Each structure stands twice: as C-alpha cells, then as structure tokens.
Amino acid sequence: MKKSILSAMALVFAFAMPVAAQDGLLKKYDRRLTTPRNYVCYRTTEKMKIDGKLNEKVWQQAAQTESFVDISGFDFPKPVYDTKARLLWDDEYLYISAVLEEPNIVANLTQRDTIIYHDNDFEVFLDPTGDGQNYFEIENNARGVIFDLMLDRAYRSGGNFHIQWDCPGLKLAVQHDGTLNKQKDTDRSWTVEMAIPHKAVTRNFANPLKAGNIWRLNFSRVQWLKKGGPEENWVWTPTGEINMHAPNQWGFLQFSDKVAGNGADEFQCPYNMEAYKMLWALFYAQLDQHGKDGKYTSSLAVLGLTDADIATLPKGSNIEMEATTHQFRASVLVGGTGKRYVVDHNGKFEVL
C-alpha cells in the first residue's frame, strides 16, 4: 500500500475500544479455524524409483498420515473409503505416496491439464513459504494423468491460476490393486507415488527442502460416489468449507534432519495458535464485510470483535486494523513474543 493511502487509514487498538455484545468472531468462524494437522517429514538415503509400487523399505519407515476426513470438518461423516499418505525428502525432492481404498477404479481423462477432478483423483497443495501467495497444486487420476498449476493467491482474494506452470522435473506413477475401468469385478485400491523437485517450487536461490523448515501442505481426494454427483471431498486436514483454496487451513509439514526409521522429532508449531486464529477470524470478517457493503472497515466493533475474543489472546497482545474501501491490513501483536502476525486483503500472511 502507498504511504499516502496508509496515512489516511484509521488505526484501531482492540483493547481500548467498545465491543458488541454478541457471540464473537471466533465462534462465528470456528469451523474455518480448526487447528491444522501436522506431519514431521524424515529424510531418505535410498535411491527412490518412482513406479507407484512403494517397494522401497523406507516407505514403510515413513510415518503415515491420519486417515482423510470430510473437507467440512472432523465432525462430518467419515469417508466411505480410506485414504492415507506418507512423505519423505532428500536434498533434491519431496516424495509423496498415497494409498486410496477403492472398490471400482475408474479414470476416463487422458490429456494433461484437463480438469482432472471430473474423474476420481488425488490432489496435492503446497505452499513452501507459508504466506498464501504463489502456491502450487498437482492433481492426478488413476491413469496417472496430471493437472498441475500455480496460483498467485486464493480465489477468495481474487486469485488467478496459471495452467502454463507444468511442474518441471515432476516424477509421478500410479499402480492398481485391481483393474481399471472394469465394472464387473471388485478392486481394492490404487496407489500414487511422486517426486517433486525443489527447483520446481523454489521462488529464489534458497532450497526450501531444509531441516527445520515448515511448509503448508494439504491433500485432497475427489470421489464421485454416484453419477452426476455431488462429488465427495476428502482431505488430510479440513478447511471447514468446500474450498481447498484456504492455505491458512492447510497442514504443517516440518522437515527433520533424521533419516526415516532412525528416531523421531516432535512437531514444533511455528505460531501461537490463539493469535493465529484471531488473525484469520478478522480476515474472514473483512471478506464478509466487503461482500455485504462493498467496502472494508477499520472498525473492529463493526466486524463483530468481542471481549470474549480478546480474552483468548496472550497477555500483552493487541490488534490493529487498517482499511480503505478495497484494501485492508489486519495484525495481531502476540504478547510476550515481540512478533506480529499480519494478513492483508490478498490473503498474504507475514510474521514481522
């Protein structure tokens, strides 16, 4: 934002303002504020053959994710078929495998960069920097046909997708425990294995595949249980709505320097989750405000912030909101840390 615009913006501190007597933002948006799942990814020293067979011993030493759940939340009905994934890494690649339980393996699409989720599919969403900008999506069906794209930001913030991005150096293979497109028999599952080179998802000269780094990651499985739909959306960690393009709700992928099978690291959450959830509640409230009145607001009272919301934050925290008609910047200073979490109208997240 330009300085002239910033100088005209209103600055409001939540702890000095009157707030409305209502349920509050955290309750209003609680379904979209669940704590994301996390995964600690260990190194592999084996040479990985990407054939979909998962024969390498290290795959069995890699931790398995939890079973996928409904995209709308943990309290929604359990998916009919089970899906789990595993991850590994080395200096060149992020390795992903998934096993999708499936009694009838079907895949009709054969051309790259068609809308693969019109078939049953498996999808990977990656944001190596965690800022919600310029993230990556890779989809494939049971034929191994790929749809890969990059998005400058989420659709909710006016984002654009770039199908021209073909993940350079991607290796991907599938295998079937059953038969493809044969309706009269009963299949068991199909398997995906892929290797994503770090150079394909690197924004600068620094390799994001590094012990201690934390990416944002999610998996999705689109399943057509009946012809004509609606489709089922089963995911590793739920976004709280039928929308995968909410990078703030993706899981945390933490890279360990340990080799898979040689010890374990505990996940270290990079954020104070109370402050993080507060920030994104403000973001969602601003989206609704703009949808209602055609403009953002600098008033936290208008957005619906309550004393109960504020009380969830660490002692010494404060909230700031700057807004013009079509832009906003929300921030939460996390008490006792000196860190400020910031998000703007584009969904760009920063820690200052």
What are the language-model segments listed below?
Residues 281, 286-311:
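Short, glycine/small-hydrophobic-rich surface segments
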Residues 21-291, 324-327, 338-340:
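Structural preference for beta-rich elements and adjacent junctions enriched in aromatics
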Residues 307-336:
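Exposed beta-strand-loop-beta-strand "reactive/processing" segments of non-cytosolic proteins
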Residues 2, 13, 256, 347-348:
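In a subset of proteins, long, contiguous C-terminal domains/tails are tracked
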Residues 1-24:
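Bacterial Sec-dependent N-terminal signal peptides
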Residues 337-352:
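A short, surface-exposed beta-strand/turn
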